[in-house]
């Protein structure tokens, strides 16, 4: 057999030349100790703060404490599979989640993994969960209304696109119901073709029962609202790091719409539970505790999250992200640590009261304590015209009602004020799942403010409202369309409305 040395050496040279030199280098550490959802890892010298790491069992974690001789890692999931001495490898990426329209209609966990059994997420883009909020220059002041469909809020405590409005109250006062109605109210906008009118909804459930979240998703599905919503669920049975990261993940998903010239609203339900999860993580990482045992940077935790809600200017695409954080108080104590923090960060609060809730005033909004610091500039002209007086009248009514308990002989003007106040309070009640369009609210509030309900028994106010709306919807659709399109109540339209309201009032006389 003839061995051709030259040919063999040529082949060898060719193969050596084409030999891939890229050897994959992974930085690996070792678990020193693990317990309570925290792992101490040795050997990850170059790990970044907030970087995702992977354990042997496939469970992931996030490096939070970078100390001199070890790294404190919080574990996203169960720590049962992790043993001392196991290896941990860096992934090289900061925690990120999938974003985009492919997430609409889906339920995901705090890391963006689907948990609704509908297959993988159709998304190509990923974003870091914790990014810097937009600066001052790319922003624009809030000027468009974000309608909730609730008379008590849209008339008295208006919310604008890009605003952060806190929903605060004790347990079982209807905080989630307000958020749910706001989401359902966007259905008519999504039925139309106007992209600018559409408002995509992101709902983050933090530390809630799984049954509650499932119920919420079912309502969205039944009402046809899930198709324009994303639900992120970090339930009570999930690890604390998942409850901590879920709001940031939801925010990243909402920012996709904001940065692409679309509009979104995000509900954090609720941030008290996120603060508790963060406190648990911080204490286990041996960070020094502060007031109420929360770590010193719990204010920064919420401020950096809520500052990401913004109305962008023309150069940045005109998108917006509106935030509705929810805070649960204990026995109406608004002066506790977390509530005061979040009140000072947000642009106003909707304060819900247990007493009002049990009196049947639902939504149980305390109009005196609730404010919207920027929303009034976002109200439509039509709503401004009719709702201007209502807040003052209700404030006077509450003041008088307190005095009226003592005295029986009241003068005529006081009697008239109490009379009107009781009817306006009745008028602002609204059953769940029945949001009203802006133009319908204008008609109803017009009737209340202009005294057409004063002679009516309080029990008939609801029937009056339904009859008025029924008449407008069946016979005056052109009026509703005119007010909706112009967003103003012209003199001609006001006269038409006056006629309809007077006719309705006569039928009740």
UniProtKB/Swiss-Prot annotation:
One of its GO terms (molecular function) is ADP binding. It is found in: Cell inner membrane. PROSITE patterns: ATPASE_ALPHA_BETA (PS00152). It is a peripheral membrane protein. Keywords: ATP synthesis, ATP-binding, Cell inner membrane, Cell membrane, CF(1), Hydrogen ion transport, Ion transport, Membrane, Nucleotide-binding, Translocase, Transport. GO terms for cellular component: plasma membrane; proton-transporting ATP synthase complex. Pfam families: ATP-synt_ab, ATP-synt_ab_C, ATP-synt_ab_N. SUPFAM superfamilies: C-terminal domain of alpha and beta subunits of F1 ATP synthase (SSF47917), N-terminal domain of alpha and beta subunits of F1 ATP synthase (SSF50615), P-loop containing nucleoside triphosphate hydrolases (SSF52540). The record marks 370 as: Required for activity. Its EC number is 7.1.2.2. It is an enzyme of class 7 (translocase). Transmembrane segments: none annotated. It catalyses: ATP + H2O + 4 H(+)(in) = ADP + phosphate + 5 H(+)(out). ATP binds at residues 169-176. Gene3D superfamilies: 2.40.30.20, ATP synthase alpha/beta chain, C-terminal domain, P-loop containing nucleotide triphosphate hydrolases. CDD domains: ATP-synt_F1_alpha_C (cd18113), ATP-synt_F1_alpha_N (cd18116), F1-ATPase_alpha_CD (cd01132). Belongs to the ATPase alpha/beta chains family. F-type ATPases have 2 components, CF(1) - the catalytic core - and CF(0) - the membrane proton channel. CF(1) has five subunits: alpha(3), beta(3), gamma(1), delta(1), epsilon(1). CF(0) has three main subunits: a(1), b(2) and c(9-12). The alpha and beta chains form an alternating ring which encloses part of the gamma chain. CF(1) is attached to CF(0) by a central stalk formed by the gamma and epsilon chains, while a peripheral stalk is formed by the delta and b chains. NCBIfam families: atpA, PRK13343.1. Produces ATP from ADP in the presence of a proton gradient across the membrane. The alpha chain is a regulatory subunit. PANTHER family: ATP SYNTHASE SUBUNIT ALPHA, MITOCHONDRIAL (PTHR48082:SF2). This is ATP synthase subunit alpha. It comes from Methylorubrum extorquens (strain PA1) (Methylobacterium extorquens).
């Amino acid at each position: 057999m003839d061995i051709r040395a030259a040919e063999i050496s040529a082949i060898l040279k060719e193969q050596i030349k084409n030999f891939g030199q890229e050897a994959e280098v992974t930085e690996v550490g070792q678990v020193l100790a693990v317990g309570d959802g925290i792992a101490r890892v040795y050997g990850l010298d170059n790990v970044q703060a907030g970087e995702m790491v992977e354990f042997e069992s496939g469970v992931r974690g996030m490096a939070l404490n970078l100390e001199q001789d070890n790294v404190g890692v919080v574990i996203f999931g169960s720590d049962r599979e992790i043993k001392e001495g196991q290896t941990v490898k860096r992934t090289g990426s900061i925690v990120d989640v999938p974003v985009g329209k492919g997430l609409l209609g889906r339920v995901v966990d705090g890391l963006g993994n689907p948990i609704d059994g509908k297959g993988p997420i159709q998304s190509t883009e990923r974003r870091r969960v914790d990014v810097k909020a937009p600066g001052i220059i790319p922003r624009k002041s809030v000027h468009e209304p974000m309608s909730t469909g609730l008379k008590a809020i849209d008339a008295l405590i208006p919310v604008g696109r890009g605003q952060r409005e806190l929903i605060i109250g004790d347990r079982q006062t209807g905080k989630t119901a307000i958020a749910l109605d706001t989401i359902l109210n966007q259905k008519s906008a999504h039925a139309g073709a106007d992209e600018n009118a559409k408002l995509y909804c992101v709902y983050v459930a933090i530390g809630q029962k799984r049954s509650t979240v499932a119920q919420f998703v079912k309502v969205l599905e039944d009402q046809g609202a899930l198709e324009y919503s994303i639900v992120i669920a970090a339930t009570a049975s999930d690890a604390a790091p998942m409850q901590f990261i879920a709001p940031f993940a939801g925010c990243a998903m909402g920012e996709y719409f904001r940065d692409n010239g679309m509009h979104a609203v995000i509900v954090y339900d609720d941030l008290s539970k996120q603060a508790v999860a963060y406190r648990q993580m911080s204490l286990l990482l041996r960070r020094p505790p502060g007031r109420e045992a929360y770590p010193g940077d719990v204010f920064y935790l919420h401020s950096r999250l809520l500052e990401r809600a913004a109305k962008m200017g023309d150069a940045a695409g005109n998108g917006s992200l509106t935030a509705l954080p929810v805070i649960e108080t204990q026995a109406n104590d608004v002066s506790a640590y977390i509530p005061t923090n979040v009140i000072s960060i947000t642009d106003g609060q909707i304060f819900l009261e247990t007493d009002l809730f049990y009196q049947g005033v639902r939504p149980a909004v305390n109009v005196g304590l609730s404010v919207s610091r920027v929303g009034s500039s976002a109200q439509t002209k039509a709503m401004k015209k009719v709702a201007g007086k209502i807040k003052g009248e209700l404030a006077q009514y509450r003041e008088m009602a307190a005095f009226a308990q003592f005295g029986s002989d009241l003068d005529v003007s006081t009697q008239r004020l109490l009379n009107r106040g009781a009817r306006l309070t009745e008028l602002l009640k609204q059953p769940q799942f029945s949001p009203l369009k802006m133009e319908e609210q204008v008609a109803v509030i017009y009737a209340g403010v202009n005294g057409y309900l004063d002679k009516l028994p309080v029990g008939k106010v609801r029937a009056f409202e339904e009859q008025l709306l029924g008449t407008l919807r069946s016979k005056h659709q052109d009026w509703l369309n005119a007010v909706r399109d112009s967003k103003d109540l012209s003199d001609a339209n006001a006269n038409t409305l006056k006629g309809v309201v007077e006719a309705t009032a006569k039928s009740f006389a």
